[in-house]
């Protein structure tokens, strides 16, 4: 944890730990005429400090993507004690955005560029019976049984530093497709399949394209060798389907000295333990 930082005459930089349900947002980044997470948070802060602010996030999540542990920074000219900011902002924010915590950080601390890693989780709900409570948070995938062990095995070679242009959607201004993948996992918990990737950064659309291709391996439509060849040979044209955004969540962001305990991020995620509720219909 960081030591306390005194505010300067030019303002105090705050780190914010943010949770949001992305269903009704057009992503994080401010867009003219669209409802975005960045805009609603900036409006809430500006209404308190009476000056415009810019809130910078560690990861710019796409339309419909959720966050349990998004981290952002903002510089404010205000005498408000740091510990009061979450309560003040939550009273002004819509119900689908929550400030979980705030911390004072040095003036040069940057939510995006100071980060060492980001961790995303993609969740599939595989029972044939729909679940209204899981619908906003998962991809309801019940069309074919998934070989989760095969999916987990084919993910492992991704660990390391690789060109991952096969999982890079068009529309990004990023100059390269190098990604350092630090950890991967794929596991089943009852009717849920959870895919997690931790990396130094993520390409535009990377997780959803990766999951879309991985599911093809799990259902037997594509071989493990084909999956590996596609990303190693950068065959972007063969990655034709992106998984829906509803199943994707930014779990957390890591820093050399984190302003927040990681537990604050992970505890915010609902932990569903679901067995099949329609065994007579189950195809798994």
Curated annotation (Swiss-Prot):
Binding site for substrate: 120
Reactions that this protein is recorded to catalyse: uridine(38/39/40) in tRNA = pseudouridine(38/39/40) in tRNA
Cited Pfam families: PseudoU_synth_1
GO molecular function (one): RNA binding
Annotated active site: 62
InterPro entries per the UniProt record, alphabetical: PsdUridine_synth_cat_dom_sf (IPR020103), PsdUridine_synth_TruA (IPR001406), PsdUridine_synth_TruA_a/b_dom (IPR020097), PsdUridine_synth_TruA_C (IPR020095), TruA/RsuA/RluB/E/F_N (IPR020094)
Its EC number(s): 5.4.99.12
Domain of life of the native organism: Bacteria
Catalytic EC class: isomerase
Keyword field contains NADP: no
Keywords: Isomerase, tRNA processing
A GO biological process held by the record: tRNA pseudouridine synthesis
Role this protein plays: Formation of pseudouridine at positions 38, 39 and 40 in the anticodon stem and loop of transfer RNAs.
PANTHER family: PSEUDOURIDYLATE SYNTHASE, TRNA PSEUDOURIDINE SYNTHASE-LIKE 1
Subunit comment: Homodimer.
Family, as annotated: Belongs to the tRNA pseudouridine synthase TruA family.
Protein's UniProt name: tRNA pseudouridine synthase A
Source organism: Thermosynechococcus vestitus (strain NIES-2133 / IAM M-273 / BP-1)
Gene, per the UniProt record: truA
């Amino acid at each position: 944890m960081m030591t306390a930082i005194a505010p300067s005459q030019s303002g105090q930089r705050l780190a914010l730990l943010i949770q949001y349900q992305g269903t009704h947002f057009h992503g994080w980044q401010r867009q003219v005429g669209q409802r975005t997470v960045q805009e609603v948070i900036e409006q809430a802060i500006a209404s308190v400090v009476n000056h415009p602010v810019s809130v910078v996030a560690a990861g710019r999540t796409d339309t419909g993507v959720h966050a349990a542990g998004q981290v952002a920074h903002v510089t404010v000219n205000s005498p408000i004690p740091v510990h009061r900011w979450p309560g003040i902002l939550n009273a002004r924010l819509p119900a689908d955005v929550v400030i979980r915590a705030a911390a004072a950080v040095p003036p040069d601390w940057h939510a995006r560029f100071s980060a060492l890693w980001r961790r995303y989780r993609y969740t599939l709900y595989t029972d044939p019976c729909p679940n209204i409570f899981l619908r906003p948070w998962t991809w309801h995938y019940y069309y074919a049984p998934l070989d989760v062990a095969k999916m987990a095995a084919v993910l492992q070679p991704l660990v390391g530093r690789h060109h991952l242009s096969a999982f890079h959607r068009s529309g990004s201004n990023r100059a390269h497709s190098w990604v350092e993948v630090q950890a991967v996992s794929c596991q089943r918990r009852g009717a849920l399949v959870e895919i997690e990737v931790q990396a130094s950064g993520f390409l535009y659309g990377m997780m959803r394209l990766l999951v879309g291709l991985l599911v093809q391996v799990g259902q037997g439509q594509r071989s493990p060798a084909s999956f590996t060849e596609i990303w190693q040979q950068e065959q972007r044209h063969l990655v034709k389907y992106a998984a829906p955004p509803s199943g994707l969540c930014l779990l957390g962001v890591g820093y050399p000295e984190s302003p927040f305990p990681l537990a604050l991020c992970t505890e915010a995620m609902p932990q569903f333990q679901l067995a099949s509720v329609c065994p007579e219909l189950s195809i798994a």
